[in-house]
Amino acid sequence: MVEIDPFEMAVKQLERAAQYMDISEEALEWLKKPMRIVEVSVPIEMDDGSVKVFTGFRVQHNWARGPTKGGIRWHPAETLSTVKALATWMTWKVAVVDLPYGGGKGGIIVNPKELSEREQERLARAYIRAVYDVIGPWTDIPAPDVYTNPKIMGWMMDEYETIMRRKGPAFGVITGKPLSIGGSLGRGTATAQGAIFTIREAAKALGIDLKGKKIAVQGYGNAGYYTAKLAKEQLGMTVVAVSDSRGGIYNPDGLDPDEVLKWKREHGSVKDFPGATNITNEELLELEVDVLAPAAIEEVITEKNADNIKAKIVAEVANGPVTPEADDILREKGILQIPDFLCNAGGVTVSYFEWVQNINGYYWTEEEVREKLDKKMTKAFWEVYNTHKDKNIHMRDAAYVVAVSRVYQAMKDRGWVKK
């Protein structure tokens, strides 16, 4: 795999899209840099009485369109470059689906598997104490991400509320919370559900009837599992392959996503699932399928393997699974890509719905959430697809044009840039 600096990749994608826009050089230079970067030391007492200091980040890329929004990642290999890149991509993600937000992202360099639950709670609360003055319902709204979850969001929300002495709508400071403290119905499946809506619309654009067509899903975490499950249940597709970090499985007659999940929980991996053939993650990407959904990690489709991709639609459920060089190859092959910050925007869209519900103190049914998400994702897909057709440019570039144009307009209307 080619090692590419994540933030350099984000800037490269922006520069590429700028070729198709009438955007001033000063605005472009501004958009290449986050507006705020916070690095903090997060000391906590460990269960054995010792004190350990962790490094944390919070990056706010651009708030021209509203408060910044983005998850908090706990990962042993977390880097500032990754957090900056993800905050930048969040700006485009919230803009492409027309949410009144900017992009943010947070992270802590930690292996949470090495912490007890009590240590995790201390870390969550200590992080909020370190960054509370730069977050808030009207400023920057975190959410769960890699190795963080609703329970951790609950602790963080409670710590923020304690510090602020319960002034204002504290529930709205963080999304992805447990239902009992302001969480939203539909949040758990939101990323995958949004991706399914875009896959459905992409098939319409290509004139493909998805019923009985084949899909392969790389990655079997929350997003990967629900993408497979909903593709089967809502679109009538045949799930022929799935994988996790240890490898994948293939059955041309179809897999039952629920049974595979049960197997993974019992055995730690999808590998060796009865009735399926073990395959590598690399082999999964190159299968003869109609839809390929990379839902795991960054940079899995590169210039080295892009020419071997056989899917008609590549739905980027993960962040950054296709490199810029591979983008060109896939387009030359006539493959329709649903770019990551459009395809996986369902999660942040339902996070926005959660925030709206928190601010108003009124909660929607799961069906209402799904209907509102469908409208948002469908509208966003066709805005991007029509831009792609009108300008004869790549779908990712089209998504950037739609998103960056909205941010650029907000910057001009605020008087930040004159042209």
Swiss-Prot record:
Amino-acid positions noted as binding NAD(+) in the UniProt annotation, renumbered to this chain: G219, Y220, G221, N222, A223, G224, Y225
EC number: 1.4.1.3
Keyword terms of this UniProt record: NAD, NADP, Oxidoreductase
Catalytic function, reaction form: L-glutamate + NAD(+) + H2O = 2-oxoglutarate + NH4(+) + NADH + H(+); L-glutamate + NADP(+) + H2O = 2-oxoglutarate + NH4(+) + NADPH + H(+)
A GO molecular-function descriptor: glutamate dehydrogenase (NADP+) activity
Pfam family, one: ELFV_dehydrog_N
Active-site residue numbers: K105
One BP annotation, GO: glutamate catabolic process
Residue ranges of coiled coil: none
Domain of life: Archaea
Family annotation (PROSITE patterns): GLFV_DEHYDROGENASE
UniProt xrefs under InterPro entries: Aminoacid_DH-like_N_sf (IPR046346), GLPV_dehydrogenases (IPR053388), Glu/Leu/Phe/Val/Trp_DH (IPR006095), Glu/Leu/Phe/Val/Trp_DH_C (IPR006096), Glu/Leu/Phe/Val/Trp_DH_dimer (IPR006097), Glu/Leu/Phe/Val_DH_AS (IPR033524), Glu_DH (IPR014362), NAD(P)-bd_dom_sf (IPR036291)
Record's subunit section: Homohexamer.
UniProt family annotation: Belongs to the Glu/Leu/Phe/Val dehydrogenases family.
NCBIfam families, per database record: GdhA_Arch
Protein name: Glutamate dehydrogenase
Gene giving rise to this polypeptide: gdhA
